[in-house]
């Protein structure tokens, strides 16, 4: 997967726009949000996407995101925080409550590094965002070699990141997949980050300028003879 659209269930998106996203050339969708997420909205969005053959991932930020019938669950593990609530605390509580019913084969953990100090998610998780390139590379190696996480996700959350940071962190990984999200608002930015990331995630621009969002996916569309 080179490209995923991230949809916020707390935001409205017309069905016609959703159809355009499905046929844009993207490789799939993440449904996720930081706040004001209601299970009814999650279910409605999931059902609207249900007829596509593209993978749909539910990124679980809180219990209100849990939809038992979902095919894929993403579990964020925030690496650059000293608040254990976001590295394993909430995770342990949920497993204690629901462990016997969790479909583990459909669950994938993501090692998150959040780098936009002004983002809601940075404030919520108390993320330490003033990191050097060396810090971020070390987190990448931690994710792969100590925690054996399948995904290392660098999240600039609304702000376009530093391609050099992405290049260095990606180069430090051998087996863990590198995902990049944050501030992609043009096909040029999409192409730039895709040079280094295994997968790029495009979110906010969907709700700001749909046509530009679509352009970020069309560059990955398979050409037919």
Swiss-Prot record:
Sn-glycerol 1-phosphate binds at residues 6, 153-158, 183, 203-204. Its EC number is 2.5.1.n9. One of its GO terms (biological process) is glycerophospholipid biosynthetic process. Keywords: Lipid biosynthesis, Lipid metabolism, Magnesium, Metal-binding, Phospholipid biosynthesis, Phospholipid metabolism, Transferase. Its cofactor is Mg(2+). InterPro entries: GGGP/HepGP_synthase_I, GGGP/HepGP_synthase_sf, GGGP_HepGP_synthase. Mg(2+) binds at residues 8, 34. Pfam families: PcrB. GO terms for molecular function: heptaprenylglyceryl phosphate synthase activity; magnesium ion binding. Pathway: Membrane lipid metabolism; glycerophospholipid metabolism. CDD domains: PcrB_like (cd02812). It catalyses: sn-glycerol 1-phosphate + all-trans-heptaprenyl diphosphate = 3-heptaprenyl-sn-glycero-1-phosphate + diphosphate. Transmembrane segments: none annotated. Homodimer. PANTHER family: HEPTAPRENYLGLYCERYL PHOSPHATE SYNTHASE, PTHR40029. Belongs to the GGGP/HepGP synthase family. Group I subfamily. HAMAP family: GGGP_HepGP_synthase (MF_00112). Prenyltransferase that catalyzes in vivo the transfer of the heptaprenyl moiety of heptaprenyl pyrophosphate (HepPP; 35 carbon atoms) to the C3 hydroxyl of sn-glycerol-1-phosphate (G1P), producing heptaprenylglyceryl phosphate (HepGP). This reaction is an ether-bond-formation step in the biosynthesis of archaea-type G1P-based membrane lipids found in Bacillales. This is Heptaprenylglyceryl phosphate synthase. The lineage of its organism: Bacteria, Bacillati, Bacillota, Bacilli, Bacillales.
